[in-house]
Amino acid sequence: MAGVLDEALTTVFRTPVRLRAAGRTDAGVHATGQVAHLDVPGTALPNAYPRAPHVGEAEFGPLLRRLGRFLPTDVRVVDITRAPAGFDARFSALRRHYVYRLSTAPWGVLPQQARYVTAWPRPLDVEAMAAASRDLLGLHDFAAFCRHRENATTIRDLQRLDWTRDGDLITARVSADAFCWSMVRSLVGALLAVGENRRPVSWCRELLSATNRSSDYATAPAHGLTLVGVDYPPDDQLAARNLITRDVRSR
């Protein structure tokens, strides 16, 4: 997605620009709440929208419309605003929110939902999955649930991980200050092993003592996962949050 947007923005502004997103999602993962920023030279702004906004239209309304014409139908930019001083889409963020959806229906997933719901046509003990999830909340080293990246910390503050069932549809809602590579899909994959009674509830907690990614579970399919939101502090705290996050991530 980032490459597609960079190409479209470069075309619109007629100068090379690079978008920086709040979260770098795995291939196949969806995002309805992604936030990103880019720095644009002032001289390039007239290239993007030579016409003034319509009466009552937002400042970047013309840019929003024009950008939409350069993007494929499965990529949309829904809002553009001026960023406050000190804002960084990635490092100023307080937390990210993800949703994972799967269906246990024996016949699979409805065609109109198949792009964002994983078919899991077998019984799941949601109460056991919820109990195992509670053991994972808080500040931990999630190395067992992260793909290795050189010099990258795997310590994260997992603030929410709960499950709900609505008929055959099972939904996980996951929030943390940040997620390492494939962490959400790995958490879901491990918890599915608990839900199928292949592992006890205590197993996920035991994985937290590992220093490397575990091979005892399968990562959940990417298409069931969606980034649904990113939280930021008040404008006057953005720069400080940026510095704090950079310091933590560099350790």
UniProtKB/Swiss-Prot annotation:
GO molecular function, one term: tRNA pseudouridine(38-40) synthase activity
EC number: 5.4.99.12
Keywords: Isomerase, tRNA processing
Reactions catalysed according to its record: uridine(38/39/40) in tRNA = pseudouridine(38/39/40) in tRNA
Residues of the active site: D26
Pfam families in alphabetical order: PseudoU_synth_1
InterPro entries: PsdUridine_synth_cat_dom_sf, PsdUridine_synth_TruA, PsdUridine_synth_TruA_a/b_dom, PsdUridine_synth_TruA_C, TruA/RsuA/RluB/E/F_N
Binding residue positions for substrate: Y98
Membership in a protein family: Belongs to the tRNA pseudouridine synthase TruA family.
Subunit structure, interactors included: Homodimer.
Name listed for the protein in its UniProt record: tRNA pseudouridine synthase A
